[in-house]
């Protein structure tokens, strides 16, 4: 089938845009990309027009005035004047002064984050300020006339050390398909920071973040509405899958609607998603005095406005699934200003150790250093993988763990060694739930379509038919592999892990991290040294819990064979690391809480959610922000659905919050057998089913 699709694509690519539009029966537009048109034709042909007709919409919007949810240039300039004082990068400030300046703005962001979806006492409506105001918190510059953006342009053009507007770029520290990163410092050299540029930011001009809804109903009919990103499934098909992945997730993050159990999500481009992750992680981890993440100082945009006239805005747009409206700005880049990890990456450090350390004479020292790495990473994941957050990094590997020095320590052999702080970085593909909204990466057109084609998300359970405590990535591929031609190079295994609005198994990050560690000779040989001599320690105990004896031997042999063939393992791509697990049909545990017990990692700030708020859905499945009055309610604005209000749906709901019986924290933290888990899920489902009928 894949060959047929490739041939079909090759044939269609020779046709003109105009002819393809005529086949699709849509009006030609310069804003509609030819690849998107071809994708639409391919999907219509191979997956059925009636089915895809409800999934994908490609159309031209009619000309009109500036939409009330879209920035125009006057708004941008006005907003920038308020933010100018919080962009101190060309001033000779100390790091502390810059942090204090930026914290003033972050206080506003944090308060909106805390209040997200709470009920405003003043007007008795849902608070959505974090969504509505998100992009107004950030400076939007212009490559053509703005000093800050001109500096970024200068940095991008130069391959050498260069100074512009009070900032010096020392060197380029990273470059890839998504963008480029510079190491910079103030003129006085008082401190260094990293500027990470990510290209092709799509949605910032729409001001607000879009919300999608997934409704799990106890009965038919299902009324999915792509126009406002509303999908409906039978709860019996899907809810059990969510709870098997993340026991307790529904209890923390579900809402009771007038039609059934409701989950919310917000899908965003790479830069927007990364910026949101930084804000949320900073909020969560600082409460636990955890410093094992890269801190974001600031974020801003630079756009090329050469095609714009003052007072005008883009008037012709395309809407395709997760994509939001494009603008006639030729290119917009997003910039994150982040702390500098002065010791490089864990990947580079392990490579250095591989060249210089003898295991036999340095066993105790290596065990100490490896335990230090594992403790710092695992205690951070333990916090973020609570059911209320359900964090999935989606790209956790040694190259995405940065290292900072903080004084010195004495090793077991008496040697003085730098004290390393290991920091998890690169969150553009990550996902997390906050106050009931799942923030995740939207992917591209192809990944969005694949996500929508899962009519029954229960297929994403991936549970082993032999042992229900394990899942297999091999079970992902049969469906997705038929769609390889439309996902534009995205690794197949990453699609359900990164791009779907329900969380993947939390254990996947631990497995990708451990597998990437094993791809370094020093760690692989250390583990082999311990296994051959039957040495029990924290590292081997973790590996023995994660893998069966047979699977661990398979993984070790696979990597060792690669070493012996003198092939260098490619640790830059997540798919290459995950493929070691997938291609060898390695079973992955769903519940890995025992590995945290090995290091005595416990949480001291657990929160429980004993009530589940109601959210009323309107007649067109939009979220009502307030109670219905005269059969009408105000609704959340959307770039796809430009309305402020909607008719109320005839099926009413109790306005009071509902009790939801969930498994307690002890049940969530320990490994539950399949029968007990099924009973918990059945009880939860029955509670929700009864409450949704009230």
Swiss-Prot record:
Keyword Signal: no
Active site: 395 (proton acceptor)
Catalytic reactions on record: L-seryl-[protein] + ATP = O-phospho-L-seryl-[protein] + ADP + H(+); L-threonyl-[protein] + ATP = O-phospho-L-threonyl-[protein] + ADP + H(+)
Binding site for ATP: 173-181, 196
Protein keywords: ATP-binding, Kinase, Nucleotide-binding, Serine/threonine-protein kinase, Transferase, Virion
Source organism of this protein record: Acanthamoeba polyphaga mimivirus (APMV)
Lineage summary: Viruses, Varidnaviria, Bamfordvirae, Nucleocytoviricota, Megaviricetes
Primary location group: virion
InterPro entries named in the record: Kinase-like_dom_sf, Prot_kinase_dom, Ser/Thr_kinase_AS, Ser_Thr_kinase
Database matches in Gene3D superfamilies: Transferase(Phosphotransferase) domain 1 (1.10.510.10)
The Protein kinase domain, residue ranges: 167-548
Subcellular localization: Virion
Protein name: Putative serine/threonine-protein kinase R679
EC id: 2.7.11.1
A GO molecular function held by the record: ATP binding
Similarity comment text for this entry: Belongs to the protein kinase superfamily. Ser/Thr protein kinase family.
Tagged with keyword Calcium: no
SUPFAM superfamilies: Protein kinase-like (PK-like)
UniProt GO cellular component terms: virion component
